[in-house]
Amino acid sequence: MNIEDLVWKHALANAVRYGGKADVKAVMAKLMADAPELRQRAREVKQLVEEVVAKVNAMSPEEQLRILRERWPDALEEKKAEQKRPGIEGLPELPGVKDGVVVRFAPNPDFVLHLGSARPAILNYAYRLKYGGRFILRFEDTDPRTKKPLVTEEVNAYNAIREDLRWLGIRWDEEYIQSQRMEVYYDHARRLLEMGAAYVDLCKADEWRRLRNQGKACPHRDQPSEAQLELWDKMLEGRFGEGEAVVRIKTDLAHPDPSVRDWVAFRIIDTTKTPHPLTGDKYIVWPTYNFAVSIDDHLMGVTHVLRAQEHSVNTVKQSYVFKHFGWEQPVTIHFGRLKIEGATLSKSKLKSMKIRYDDLTLPTLAGLRNRGILPEAIWDLILSVGIKPSDSTVALANLYALNRKHVEPIANRYMFVADPVKLVFEADRELVAKVPYHPSFRERGERVYRLGPGRVELYVQRRDAAAGKVIRLMELANVEVQKIEGDVAYGRLHSLTLEEAKKAGAPIVQWVWDPVEVTVIKPIALGKKAEERGLGERHLEKVEVGAYVQFFRYGYLKKKGPLEFVYLHD
């Protein structure tokens, strides 16, 4: 299939899946995943994608579907193809699966996604692929005070999360935003108050805490439903201020965990002071996490919940809402924390740093993407950890090793010399070097260098140019370094073949002729980068921005700008 047909296929498939509007970034991500060799031509391909997406989005949904069915019916069977993703079939079976699963990924948009939050997203989606069913994206944004959704000129967390998920190859079947569902929560709160399963508490916080710790009911708990509904209406009307009234779910006042005892379902937040970025000051009575989650999991038909062990108490709290309504609670699987050695996954710490959320030194998905980590490597890491209940600690080196596996086939090889010295020697004949772009993919071609006869000048690393040492100039010749004067090394042509180099114990070194200045950016810590400058071969000018390369004896890199590269790993 030619490139244009491939772009049309993915643009139409993306539009059909998402209500008639294709997304350029999503189509690019799918293209690069399916045809990694196109990464070397990213700029050219993106221009084509933009043109095709504009044409696709101008069509009616019916026309989009018709063309897709006629030309690429296989795209409508995406689920079957996705199920072939390596590692999915090896996941442990989930209990209680009937006709597929309904799972959800429910981020709080108070920050962007990081490596840790990729775990529930990938695991839930992986099980949706394994069994079939539905994957729900639900933004849990009902705390505009302490976990205010992040919407600024620099970043809109809602959109950033969507972009991160698309980059991971995750495609949701339904999307909900809890702050847009307030009337649903109000309706269910009223029903619970009418049933006598909830009540409006007017106690002071310290008085409630004392009663709770003693396992005693507050004086408002057993008031008739009529009185409760009257207080509820006053809450909605703004007759109470922050902290003056809350709605509590009736649980077990003797429960061994005091936090479970009659937990708060609704509280008052003065949105004239802390407006919600989507709803402003329209609402002042806000559902807590546990209440909104309970209602939504039932109404959305969630069958299985996969989430971190830290939510185990929340599962207990939510069970009371399900019992009061007579609903079946989803099967819940708790997995341990994922700790990454060498990376900070704390939202609060990452948010406090005065650097962009997509800075390539951060373990945010946007930061990892900018650095050059591929989504396939993150999938491999998360699936290797799985859903075990114990905490898991992995080193960033593990992620780099997995990334190397995916980058190696697509990274063409180039020569780069850090800390260069000029090497000068005389050649009694023409020396020819044929350097393939990739040793395993000879069809990508090679560049040919012809040097000599006569004086030859090229550049090698200072550490390779020790006096009295024979070195093998990769694919070119063997030279004995005779002396070094400042930044110039002088040598003599020793021999020509690799076999002769081996006999002389000569190391193979990279070299550069007719060089260009190259800058390498090296992430060294959160918010900290180092720059290394050196000389590279002129062919690096033709490498597309965003393409992956390997510098011989140096490591893998991603091109960031004109002759500027980001170091990934060795």
Curated annotation (Swiss-Prot):
Its main location: cytoplasm. Pfam families: tRNA-synt_1c (PF00749), tRNA-synt_1c_C (PF03950). One of its GO terms (biological process) is amide biosynthetic process. Catalyzes the attachment of glutamate to tRNA(Glu) in a two-step reaction: glutamate is first activated by ATP to form Glu-AMP and then transferred to the acceptor end of tRNA(Glu). It is found in: Cytoplasm. Keywords: Aminoacyl-tRNA synthetase, ATP-binding, Cytoplasm, Ligase, Nucleotide-binding, Protein biosynthesis. This is Glutamate--tRNA ligase. The keyword Aminoacyl-tRNA synthetase applies. Gene3D superfamilies: 2.40.240.100, HUPs, leucyl-tRNA synthetase, Ribosomal Protein L25, Chain P. Belongs to the class-I aminoacyl-tRNA synthetase family. Glutamate--tRNA ligase type 2 subfamily. The gene is gltX. InterPro entries: Gln/Glu-tRNA_Ligase, Glu-tRNA-synth_arc/euk, Glu/Gln-tRNA-synth, Glu/Gln-tRNA-synth_Ib_cat-dom, Glu/Gln-tRNA-synth_Ib_codon-bd, Rbsml_bL25/Gln-tRNA_synth_N, Ribosomal_bL25/Gln-tRNA_synth, Rossmann-like_a/b/a_fold. GO terms for cellular component: cytosol. Its EC number is 6.1.1.17. One of its GO terms (molecular function) is glutamate-tRNA ligase activity. NCBIfam families: gltX_arch, PRK04156.1. A motif ('HIGH' region) lies at residues 107-117. The keyword Kinase does not apply. It comes from the Archaea. It catalyses: tRNA(Glu) + L-glutamate + ATP = L-glutamyl-tRNA(Glu) + AMP + diphosphate. PANTHER family: GLUTAMATE--TRNA LIGASE, GLUTAMINE-TRNA LIGASE.
